[in-house]
Amino acid sequence: MAEFLIEPRIRGFISLTSHPAGCAKNIDLQIERIRSENLPMGQKNGLQNVLVIGSSTGYGLGAALTACFGYGANVLGVCFERKPEGEKPGSAGWYNSARASETAAQDNLIFQTINGDAFSDDIKTQTIESIKKEYGKIDLVIYSLAAPRRDDGQGNVWNSVLKPIDQRYEGKSFDLRKESITDISIEPATADEILGTQKVMGGEDWQEWIELLAEQKLLADGARTVAFSYIGPEITQALYRNGTIGEAKKHLENTAIALDKVLGQTSNNTTGTVGGAWISVNKAVVTQASSAIPVVGLYMSILFRLLNERNENESTCCLLYTSPSPRDLSTSRMPSSA
């Protein structure tokens, strides 16, 4: 293979380049950390087949790695990543997924990925067929999608925006390209922008996935599902939690309540788990999505420094084993309001 130099290329808040060796090393370190926990593997943990929608970066990746290399589950991930072409590197998520699959195969574990738009009917169909042929009924569905747009398959293309509601937002941001702190001003969202953001980042697609799996009889008795959310510090409330994304998160949380009422009616006689739906609210993490939020980059740089000083800065893979165990999740119900 010819050698070539990979240099960072930044556009806005997104790095257009990633380093294959660096991504592989990152996955290796996460797997090493997971294995050091000596988690219960096999049927006794109630996790046999796990579907992770949004599996290539962030908390979705962390959950997928922990399910596979920690609990020994068969993992099927869905993500939308760019493949490498010649001297043009692929996206970090593509290399993450490739390394995870390679390592799983070496350890006689299953970590497979379907690469495509998780919102689309085509990818949903491919996923269903893969589950039928290679997995069997799903015990746990992790929903971890963050996207700029969604084609709902009904002729509508929705776009998500990061904007305040009813008032202009003024604050600080970090320019990655110039490596400088800048002042920003963002006008309030329109009604259409609020709705579009809800359609992309809310719970509608999550519910479609669960209903499709149920319709195809691919949810195990006592199946559970988890989606991720974030609250953020006070300094970001006007833009984030009280803005367009916050409205979408409220929709996501209300979707969890609706799904919980349905899934909570089933239980697994072997493991004793009761089905359900949960929202997992987590700490800030560096992703393309979080990098898009003004102020958050500055906030995270301070937060991580303090957490590191206290030895409390957990990686995304810690999520599934520092939370209640897969079986213990059945004892906690989704609150009536979130």
Language-model segment annotations:
Residues 5-35:
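Class I SAM-dependent methyltransferase Rossmann-like catalytic core
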Residues 126-155:
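A glycine-rich helix->loop->beta "capping" turn
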Residues 321-328:
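Conserved small/polar residues in nucleotide/adenosyl-binding loops
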Residues 79-110:
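Glycine-rich phosphate-binding loop and adjoining beta1-alpha1-beta2 segment
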Residues 115-127:
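The beta1-alpha1 cofactor-binding region of Rossmann-like NAD(H)/NADP(H)-dependent oxidoreductases
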Residues 45-78:
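Canonical Rossmann dinucleotide-binding motif of NAD(H)/NADP(H)-dependent dehydrogenases/reductases
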Residues 52-53, 143-144, 223-230, 278-281:
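Structural signature of the Rossmann-like NAD(P)-dependent dehydrogenase/reductase core
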Residues 163-265, 286-294:
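Catalytic loop of short-chain dehydrogenase/reductase
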